[in-house]
Design a protein with these regions (language model features):
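Short acidic, glycine-rich surface-loop motifs adjacent to enzyme active sites
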Residues: 46-57
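Glycine/threonine-rich flexible loop motifs
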Residues: 56-65
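Short, structured coil segments at secondary-structure junctions
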Residues: 7-8, 73, 89-91
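Short, polar loop motifs at secondary-structure junctions
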Residues: 80-86
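Anionic-ligand anchoring segments at beta-strand to alpha-helix junctions in alpha/beta enzyme folds, i.e.
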Residues: 1-45
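Long, well-ordered, tryptophan-enriched scaffold segments
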Residues: 88-222
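A short helix->loop->beta-strand "cap" motif at the edges of active sites that frequently abuts
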Residues: 69-76
Length: 222
């Protein structure tokens, strides 16, 4: 608060505006929700832990103890960091990277996983927005918006479960709340005259040029 007050702000200010608000906003925009940054990785069920893009020494003691236990039980710990300090010093593998280029490396990793189909398709279909239909109507005000239930003649209750997916068994668009067993992750469909595509297909399309070679030129990681 002291730093912000030097600029005469009438607003309440504390360290959270610098160390936590950005994290919360990023998580809300990317995965639809937020939790305190010390939520931590699921090391109890992991065999490989990659730490990157984080102010590692800001983490709490419980995470330090969890990593120690993870390594003792045979887990592999990889640290991606410009300098080998803190957690990087005890990592099984340290990957030096140019500062500020973590995003490019993550895009390249995503490119490989998506194109090699080495990800958990059932998890993506059931627990992410990957199957949710996006309106593909360039020039329209609806272009790029998720197809919601009201667009498909459903009650206009704006809830994530009211977003639509393509049910491969019923061969039609249904609400997420109906919990279809096989929502499509790829394809082009028409619902009430609107062309739609699953969000996952748009993600795959956006990753097309994010090859490891592309990322290497940016990150220095080969």
């Amino acid at each position: 608060g002291l730093f912000a007050r030097q600029f005469g702000t009438p607003n309440y200010a504390a360290h959270g505006g610098f160390c936590s608000v950005n994290m919360a906003a990023g998580m809300i925009y990317s995965i639809g929700g937020s939790f305190w940054e010390f939520g931590g990785p699921d090391l109890e069920n992991a065999k490989l832990f990659i730490m990157m893009g984080t102010a590692e020494d800001h983490h709490s003691n419980p995470l330090k103890m969890a990593i120690s236990k993870f390594k003792r039980e045979g887990g592999k710990f990889i640290s991606v960091n410009p300098v080998r300090t803190g957690y990087s010093a005890i990592a099984d593998e340290w990957i030096p990277i140019r500062p500020g280029t973590d995003g490019a490396l993550l895009l390249a990793i995503s490119h490989v996983l998506v194109n090699a189909e080495t990800f958990d398709t059932d998890f993506v279909a059931q627990f992410t927005n990957g199957p949710q239909l996006v309106i593909d109507a360039p020039g329209s005000e609806k272009h790029g918006q998720f197809l919601r239930a009201d667009v498909a003649d459903k009650p206009p209750i704006y809830d994530q479960l009211d977003q639509m997916v393509w049910d491969q068994d019923a061969n039609k668009a249904v609400c997420m709340r109906e919990r279809p067993a096989r929502p499509a992750l790829t394809g082009r469909f028409t619902v009430n005259g609107l062309d739609v595509r699953p969000a996952f297909e748009l993600l795959k399309e956006s990753l097309a040029d994010c090859t490891p070679e592309w990322a290497q030129a940016i990150t220095g990681v080969s």
